[in-house]
Amino acid sequence: MHRDMYSSRGTGYGQQQYGSQSGYSQNLGSGYPGSSVSGGAEGGSQISLSSRHPSITGAPQETDIGGGYRSHLSTAASHYGTQYGSVYGSTSLSSSQPLSTNGLGSSVLDNRSGYVPTLPDSPKFASGSYLSPSSHGYGQKTDDLYSDKLSGYIPVDRRQYGEQSSSYLGRELQNEPTRRYADPSNFARQTDLYDRIDQASLLRGEQLLKMQSLHTSSVDAGVNRQTDYLTERSSTVRHSDQEAMHYGGRLESDPHGLSVRNTSSYASQHTPSLLGAVPRRNLDDYIYPESSSNPGYGVSLPPGRDYGTGKGIHSAASLDLDYPGGMLARGTGAAPRVDDLRKGDRASYLREFDLREEERRREDQRARDKEREREREREHDRERERQRERERQRARDRERERILERREKERQGERERERKRALEIKRDRTPTARATSKDTKERTPVPKSISRDARSSSLRRDAHHREASIRRSSPIKPIRRDYVCKVLSSRLVDMERDYVTLDKRYPRLFVPSEFSKVVVNWPKQKLTLSMHTAVSFEHDYIEDGGADVKSTSTKPLALKTGGKSVWNAKMVLMSGLSRTALEDLASDKFFEDRIPHICNILKFAVLKKDHSFMAIGGSWDPTDGMDPSVDQSSLIQTMLRHSKDKLHLDLSNCRHWNPFLEIHYDRVGTDGVFSYKEITVLFVPDLSECLPSFDVWRTQWLAHRKALTERDRLLSQEVKKDTVEVTKDAEKKSPGDTSGTPTTGTKKTVKKIIKRVVKRPVNDGKATGMKGEKSDVPEHVAIPETTVPKEESTGTSSNKKIVKKVAETGDTSDPSAKANEQTPAKTIVKKKIIKRVAKRKVAEIDNKMDGDSKKDGDSDEKKVMEVGKKSSDSGSVEMKPTAESLEDVKDENASKTVDVKQETGSPDTKKKEGASSSSKKDTKTGEDKKAEKKNNSETMSEGKKIDRNNTDEKEVKEKVTEKEIKERGGKDESRIQVKDRKKCEEPPRAGFILQTKRNKDSKLRSLSASLDSLLDYTDKDLDESSFEISLFAESLYEMLQYQMGSRIFEFLKKLRVKIVRQRNQRKRHQEELSVKQNEAKSQDKRQKTAEHEDKEASVISESAPGKDDKETSGKETVDGSREIADKEAVAKTKETLGSKEVTVGEAVNMEVENQDEEDDDGDDDPEEDPEEDPEEDPEEDPEEDPEECEEMDVANTEQEEPAEEPQKKEENLEKTSGTVADPITEAETDNRKEERGPNDSKTEIKPKSETEKHGKQDGGTSDAAKREETVDKELLQAFRFFDRNQAGYVRVEDMRVTIHSLGKFLSHREVKELVQSALLESNTGRDDRILYNKLVRLSL
């Protein structure tokens, strides 16, 4: 039974062979004519299997086969009339292409409304891979297809298929029993289907023949995939309402009990793929499922062979994974359950989805890891960069610290040297320990007979020692200053500048938001500024009781005038450079404290309110004149009005006002819209025209000083009254004890008040003389109550002055006030005064060194020391003993007339001596010594007339002041003294007195500020007044830079012409030297030949026969031959010299002509010369020849030697020839010297330097050389304008920027050549520093 059922020659379900089936035999016969139906069935099945499954042979053939089938999908599907139609219909053939391309098409069932898939598709084989999109909609065209070709087939053969087809057509609808069987009338319309099947079979046969040659591999590899196809069909093609069976009617509870021998249903199976229907499956499909041994498509494979295991793309194991539940493994045993299929597909889909999700998560994780790695790398890079930056910052800090330490060491060394010098000077003055000792045995007396000589010798010894100490001190090593050069890189001659330009030019300048533009007037019109007129400004104030009248706002003024512009007129008063300042700018002195520069010499008078500078002036008023937009002369009236009102200054005599700047503002109203335009014009008047004469200025200045003195005196009296009241209150609070120590509170108040008192009387001392009040000094020294607190409170700066003032103000103050001025602070100061007296007294007695006064000096010394001890131990009680001790000292010293004569002298001379000895740089000359001797002699003669008490008091006073000078440092005090004396005695140069109004509300004051001070602004200066002053300072600095840069530019043009000319002359000179050397060599050869001929002739004459005849004839022949040789040599030398003269004369003429042409060209157009000359001589570029400057700086000795060699040779020729040179040769030598003159211009400086070195031997020559060496002071000032610290050089890059900023529109090559010429002339080409000290000494 099973053999019949599973026959190898029949179908897998007991069907007949292919030849017994009517539908397939017809199709097969038409596809394969001439072949036996029974014999060729198996072979045909094998061939068609490989051809119908192109996916078995692999991917390359799969794509070709799929491409061949694309156009014949519908026709090829009709070839299979039997059960193959459900498998190899349009779905199976179209599955080759989606498999090879991973097709994503949706299932046909998804596009139909009647069939909704209940099981999910396989993740690897989508539903669109098995169903062709061409099978859409199928039941509607069956009538049309069957009605055409019905008569072409036998009705008996069609009946069984039609009946079976009708049953299937009935099942296409919903599950209704009434529609199970279709109407038999439809069977008559199915004839057209078979015609189409015939045509498709023919085409299919042709395709199989074509594919047979391509497919030679076994069919076994595709069984696995075919099984996959069939399993997918069984799992997916099912309606949602149906049960486990597909299209086969309802099943019973036991599907295995059904009959399985109904072969008629299989024989008459239709092809629904042509109509687009879903392939129907029978019940046997589930009872006998497909497997590797039973494919299920009508043919059984040979026994013993399993073509599905381990072959194909997907093996059975992989299919088991794709379809879980062991469906393929149970394929031969029993039919799979639907629930298993459903669960297996869902599980596989979920597993595949999880795998894909996991893979996607891994990819995302890897991407995030990579991104984190990149971020870490970037962070590492940033960290390394930060580390490098920190290292660089540390290096910079270390370098800065090293620089600061080096500077600190230099300052410390300087202070140490200063201290050593001060100690040396002090050592010269202070007595020895032996002289100051108290023991009388140690002090050896000086004999009376030699006391006067000893004193004179000691004076001489002291003076000599002082001079030696000054001469012994080594000169101060100049401090090496840093190079500072401020050069603006922008174009200086731009007239109008907007907000962006200002922000770029001046980064530190705060520009107001309403600023629109600024117009600079100095580039377009020549301004007459008082640059060389020094003006002195005296600043004062006037008390104004009224309140400060605020100026009216500018906006109502603009509305009142009816215009849209508001004008402001302001000015800045400038003090120019004096003669001494100009000399300092061009001098070679070394300045320690303050380096002179134009920016710190120029002074400007401005106003200051709070912390901001203001220009002098205000807004324009219609009363000043016409509208400034029509006539700007009305602005001058505005300035005159404001200067009188604010400064009490009359400038009506000024003629040149010089409008310097115009600053424009666009004012915005409260509504945020443009309201009006405001224009501020800044003037710099020329004050040289309106300066008063010196006599008028002297009277004005003296009256002003007198008024100041009177005002200060009144203030001092008021303050004294306040101090008396304060001291009385303090005495009431603290009862008078024996110690007399004041409280801290009273001491502080007294100190504060006394400071003011001390500062005011300085003017009294300046205004009044000192000579008339010298006689009153003892009284005030004897009663030091008024002077004591002043000296104690002033500290360090004005102690010496106060001592003077006591003598001056003593007459004006009342004696009652003196008596009442006993303050508690007097005790502290008395100690110091007594100590000073004691010390100076000891020094005085020791310096006298008088042997007769030994005992008296000892007693005096003891008394003074006792006084000092008592004063240090006790308090105010010891005031009386101090006065008595002073009187005793005076009485005991009255008998010492010699000592008085020695010591008494004018206090002025002694002060001068102290000041000169304390200062470091002042040296005593012979005149000072003579003056000292005269003063000593005068004091010797006048000493008897002077009262002893007065002289002693003067000595005490002077010694106290000298001690104070020593404590404070004599250098600074002497300078201050000299300045104060000059201020007191002589008025400064002519100028103006600026008096501002002062009241409680106003803080406005006038002051003088340098250009550096005006340029020292910051971005925190937000006022418009500060902005205007700062902008004025920057514009003025640009004007100065333009002027100084123009000087340097003109000099560089001349220097360039000179260097090019010297280079051309040097080339010609070298060519001439080479020609002359060649001629000299040829001349030497001719001379040697002539001498050789002479020797031969003499030998021939000596070898003649006969002694007498030989001698006579020999002498004659020798003489004759010599005369002939001499004549020939002279002729030859004349010829050669003539030829030389001709050639050299022509060369000289050519040089003179070329030089004249060059001079003409240089005079006509000197700017073109630097460009043309390098083109004529491109070989010797200054950058390629850096050693030329060294030759020109030192001496051009290498050129002198070859120049002198031909001259020496010519002289030798003249000596040998015995002839005298013609005048032409002398002219030639003169011309040659003239030629060498401009070439060796630098060589003329060498003898000067040599004579300077040997100046001791030849003093006159060195002085003459110094006189001849001139310095261009204007050029030196220009260079030093850019070299702020006088380092001695200017860098090449700064010089290039300077020339570019002049606005001359020069090319970079021109500027480079100009600067390079200066570099090579002053320094080597390997350096970038132009040493301008050499350039200013050149004569161009």
From Swiss-Prot:
Residues 46-60, 810-824 have a biased composition (Polar residues). The keyword Nucleus applies. Residues 828-840 have a biased composition (Basic residues). Disruption phenotype: Defective embryo arrested at cotyledon stage. Hypersensitivity to salt (NaCl) stress leading to reduced roots and shoots growth and altered germination, and associated with altered sodium (Na) homeostasis and over-accumulation of reactive oxygen species (ROS). Hypersensitivity to hydrogen peroxide H(2)O(2) and methyl viologen (MV). Expressed ubiquitously at high levels, including in guard cells. It is found in: Nucleus. Pfam families: BURAN, DBC1, LAIKA. Keywords: Calcium, Coiled coil, Nucleus, Stress response, Transit peptide. It comes from the Eukaryota. GO terms for biological process: regulation of DNA-templated transcription; response to salt stress; sodium ion homeostasis. Disulfide bonds: none annotated. Residues 7-39 have a biased composition (Low complexity). Residues 1270-1305 form the EF-hand domain. Induction: Slightly induced by salt (NaCl) stress. Signal peptide: none annotated. Required for salt tolerance and sodium (Na) homeostasis after salt stress. Together with BHLH148/RITF1, regulates the transcription of several genes involved in the detoxification of reactive oxygen species (ROS) generated by salt (NaCl) stress. Binds calcium. This is Protein SHORT ROOT IN SALT MEDIUM 1. It comes from Arabidopsis thaliana (Mouse-ear cress). The lineage of its organism: Eukaryota, Viridiplantae, Streptophyta, Embryophyta, Tracheophyta.
